């Protein structure tokens, strides 16, 4: 029984973000569709070759996506919302882009599909939309074309397909409500057709992703798996693929399915290898997800070997990444600025492929010398002074309950804040960032490269902040922001100013569409050596009589959007960050900043996948936020911002944050998120986002007014704020001015009644 290795997927964007650049060039009309398609072909060929050269046996095909793999699956099935359809009924790449971003070089603009987090990761998918009576057919053959490409290049191909039950689980019913699970029998013939086409091409194994099987699914959904896979059996071998958690609670459902193999995430799940071996059918292949696809740390291969060695020779076995390497940067070798000690602790996607090759070879030969050599830096890290800071650990141990309590309750604070700020009804504000123009990015880049001295850099940033204040005053906004011209990314910026973080030059990972982020890496105990945001906030406030918000990224979001340490708990990291940012709140307040926003867009996405594990996470997540904020005086107004959230199931925790104002993303969901706040009788102030900043479309005054009136039916108008869904960093100034002017006009109309 020779052991093989494989990856569940590979990063799509390219080492230099070639896909992002090609997408944005095409969207802007600066390149042709053929040029865009050529970039995709080149990236796929390169990535297959890189994996092969790194020692991967079975190459994933179908993991590439022009925007998002869930959206690719929707198009495969012919699931195109009516508003995005071509007049002749055809589907092309512009159809895909209209669904993802609301517009494309061809076709009429229309509201983009809803976007939300992919399980508990920082990747976003486009939510499939279902309507009663809709029909499905094989429409978008990207998977088959890419399989043909890979076969023509001589590769050993393992197609990747999002499974039917998970795809339905991820979607939402629009219009007249019905059970979306009732669509399962309608989509299975398309899956059968795809599998038949793959069989014709000589494919032996298909990786069919059903990550919903790690969730606490309703019984009806669990029961749907058997008839679904009965319908799909017999054409090619199916590797049922799960990730992000273990499968033990649903193993009885899984073992009844007519598949030939199971992939299990042995990094994030608690499944024991011996128990899996005992309970899986003896003729099934086990794909062991031993290498963490979601982090950047070098694996302790001696430990991984010990974890799996007892079943070697007892069943067919593959070793694999825990999940797709989509969530990891591509190549550590191009990082020239990391110091050698720290660099030796990491492994990016290509290095993880090498780890899989080392592990496969050791399991096949029994020779573990190479594993011990690879794992040596991990032992050294455990004792490094770069990791441990006794002062931070002492401060963390001394936290008391009082450290997470504001001095008075919201009602008392609100009175003090009303007296201080005297804001009108329907107060208008933005979420924080303004367009990151070419001039701003060039300014930062020149400074970073040493082509610009500190004085000229600061003069340039000050000018952009001044422009942002002037623009906001001209528009008539009530609470202003400084625009964040000095910030490259809301998490990276703070990480750069906190001890305990390191950064990469090219450690890009895809967030959604063409949006890429370069997450900081937490390597040690976190502390704040000096104030971070105070200088620019104070300068912005000096330019206006209106209040200017101080802008912080909250501790849970910094944790969730960074690559965390693996040697301490996430709770420990979050509370260390909270203590560092608590000092920042105190310094902002002392500098005269009266409104401080602590963004926590990632609070919900950090939830464990199983509801039974939620309480512990929410307890420390809320406590971290409160430690961060509780130092503020009564007349300092604390805002928080959250996006891509469904709130129903965590309303107790949202209220427990005790923020004076919460702003949320609601426009894509047509204000339906406010239902949670209404039913809960949320006591504090709320700013429901009135337009979608992810789309370049400008909302009309009437549209915004209608949304606000809808909001006022659920939340008393005196507690409503008016704001966009999210920061405006990715937008251009023309559409930003137009949208904000309409937003302010809508608020003024409502004030007049």
UniProtKB/Swiss-Prot annotation:
Cofactor note (record): Binds 1 zinc ion per subunit.
Cofactor(s) for this UniProt protein: Zn(2+)
Superkingdom, taxonomy of origin: Bacteria
Chain sites annotated for binding 5-methyltetrahydropteroyltri-L-glutamate: 17-20, 117, 515-516, 561, 605
EC number(s) stated in the UniProt entry for this protein: 2.1.1.14
InterPro entries according to UniProt: Cbl-indep_Met_Synth_N, Cobalamin-indep_Met_synthase, Met_Synth_C/arc, UROD/MetE-like_sf
Reaction(s) this enzyme catalyzes, per UniProt: 5-methyltetrahydropteroyltri-L-glutamate + L-homocysteine = tetrahydropteroyltri-L-glutamate + L-methionine
TM region(s), chain numbering: none
Binding site for L-homocysteine: 431-433, 484, 599
A Gene Ontology BP annotation from the UniProt entry: methylation
SUPFAM superfamilies: UROD/MetE-like (SSF51726)
Biological pathway: Amino-acid biosynthesis; L-methionine biosynthesis via de novo pathway; L-methionine from L-homocysteine (MetE route): step 1/1
Keywords annotated in UniProt: Amino-acid biosynthesis, Metal-binding, Methionine biosynthesis, Methyltransferase, Repeat, Transferase, Zinc
Gene Ontology MF terms: 5-methyltetrahydropteroyltriglutamate-homocysteine S-methyltransferase activity; zinc ion binding
One Pfam entry name: Meth_synt_1
Active site, UniProt feature: 694
Binding site for L-methionine: 431-433, 484, 599
Residues involved in Zn(2+) binding: 641, 643, 665, 726
Family of this protein: Belongs to the vitamin-B12 independent methionine synthase family.
Function of the protein: Catalyzes the transfer of a methyl group from 5-methyltetrahydrofolate to homocysteine resulting in methionine formation.
The protein's name: 5-methyltetrahydropteroyltriglutamate--homocysteine methyltransferase
Organism in which the protein naturally occurs: Shigella boydii serotype 4 (strain Sb227)
Gene: metE
């Amino acid at each position: 029984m020779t052991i093989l290795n494989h990856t569940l997927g590979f990063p799509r964007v390219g080492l230099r973000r070639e896909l992002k650049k090609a997408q944005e060039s095409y969207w802007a009309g600066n390149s042709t569709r053929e040029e865009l398609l050529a970039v995709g072909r080149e990236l796929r060929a390169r990535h297959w070759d890189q994996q092969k050269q790194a020692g991967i046996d079975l190459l994933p095909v179908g993991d590439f996506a022009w925007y998002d793999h869930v959206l690719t699956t929707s198009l495969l099935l012919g699931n195109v919302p009516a508003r995005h359809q071509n007049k002749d009924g055809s589907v092309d790449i512009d159809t895909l882009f209209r669904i993802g971003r609301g517009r494309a070089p061809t076709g009429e603009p229309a509201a983009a599909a809803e976007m939300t987090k992919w399980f508990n990761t920082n990747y976003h998918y486009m939510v499939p939309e279902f309507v009663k009576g809709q029909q499905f057919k094989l429409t978008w053959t990207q998977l088959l074309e890419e399989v043909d490409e890979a076969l023509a290049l001589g590769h050993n191909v393992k197609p990747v397909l999002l499974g039917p039950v998970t795809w339905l689980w991820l979607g939402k019913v629009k219009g007249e409500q019905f059970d979306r699970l009732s669509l399962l029998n309608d989509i299975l013939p398309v899956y059968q057709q795809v599998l038949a086409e793959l069989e014709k091409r000589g494919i032996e194994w298909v990786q069919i992703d059903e990550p919903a099987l790690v969730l606490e699914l309703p019984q009806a959904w669990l029961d749907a798996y058997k008839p679904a896979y009965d319908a799909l059996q017999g054409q090619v071998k199916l590797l049922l693929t799960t990730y992000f958690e273990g499968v033990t609670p649903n193993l009885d459902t899984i073992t009844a399915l007519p598949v030939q193999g199971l992939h299990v995430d042995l990094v994030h799940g608690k499944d024991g290898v011996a128990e899996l071996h005992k309970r899986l059918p003896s003729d099934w292949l086990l794909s062991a997800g031993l290498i963490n696809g979601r982090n950047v740390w070098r694996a302790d291969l001696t430990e991984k070997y010990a974890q799996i060695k007892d079943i070697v020779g007892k069943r067919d076995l593959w070793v694999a990444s825990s999940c797709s390497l989509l969530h990891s940067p591509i190549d550590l070798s191009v990082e020239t600025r990391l110091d050698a000690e720290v660099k030796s602790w990491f492994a990016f996607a290509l290095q993880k492929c090498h780890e899989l090759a080392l592990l496969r070879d050791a399991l096949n030969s029994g020779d573990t010398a190479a594993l011990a050599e690879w794992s040596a830096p991990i032992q050294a890290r455990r004792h490094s002074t770069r990791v441990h800071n006794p002062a931070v650990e002492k401060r963390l141990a001394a936290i008391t309950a009082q450290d997470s309590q504001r001095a008075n309750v919201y009602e008392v604070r609100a009175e003090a804040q009303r007296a201080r700020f005297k804001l009108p009804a329907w107060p208008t504000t933005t979420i924080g960032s303004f367009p990151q123009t070419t001039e701003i990015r060039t300014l930062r880049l020149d400074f970073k490269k040493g082509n610009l001295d500190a004085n000229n850099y600061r003069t340039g940033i000050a000018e952009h902040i001044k422009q942002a204040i002037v623009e906001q005053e001209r528009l008539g906004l009530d609470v202003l922001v400084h625009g964040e011209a000095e910030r490259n990314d809301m998490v990276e910026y703070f990480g750069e100013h906190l001890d305990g973080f390191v950064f990469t030059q090219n450690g890009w990972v895809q967030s959604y569409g063409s949006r890429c982020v370069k997450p900081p890496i937490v390597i040690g105990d976190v502390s704040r050596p000096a104030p971070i945001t105070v200088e620019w906030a104070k300068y912005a406030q000096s330019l206006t009589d209106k209040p200017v918000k101080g802008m912080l990224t909250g501790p849970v979001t910094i944790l969730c959007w960074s690559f965390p340490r693996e040697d301490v708990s996430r709770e420990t990291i979050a509370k260390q960050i909270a203590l560092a940012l608590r000092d920042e709140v105190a310094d902002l307040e002392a500098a005269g900043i009266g409104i401080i926003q602590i963004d926590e867009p990632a609070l919900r996405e950090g939830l464990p996948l199983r509801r039974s594990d939620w309480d512990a996470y929410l307890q420390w997540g809320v406590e971290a936020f409160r430690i961060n904020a509780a130092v503020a005086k009564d007349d300092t107004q604390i805002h928080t911002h959250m996006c891509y959230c469904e709130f129903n199931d965590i309303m107790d925790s949202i209220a427990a944050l005790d923020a004076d104002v919460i702003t949320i993303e609601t426009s894509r969901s047509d204000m339906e998120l406010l239902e949670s706040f209404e039913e809960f009788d949320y006591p504090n102030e709320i700013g429901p986002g009135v337009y979608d900043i992810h789309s370049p479309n400008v909302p009309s005054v009437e549209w915004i007014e209608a949304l606000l009136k809808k909001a006022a039916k659920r939340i008393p108008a005196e507690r409503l704020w008016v704001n966009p869904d999210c920061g405006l960093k990715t937008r251009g100034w023309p559409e930003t001015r137009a949208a904000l002017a309409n937003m302010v006009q809508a608020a003024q109309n409502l004030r007049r009644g």
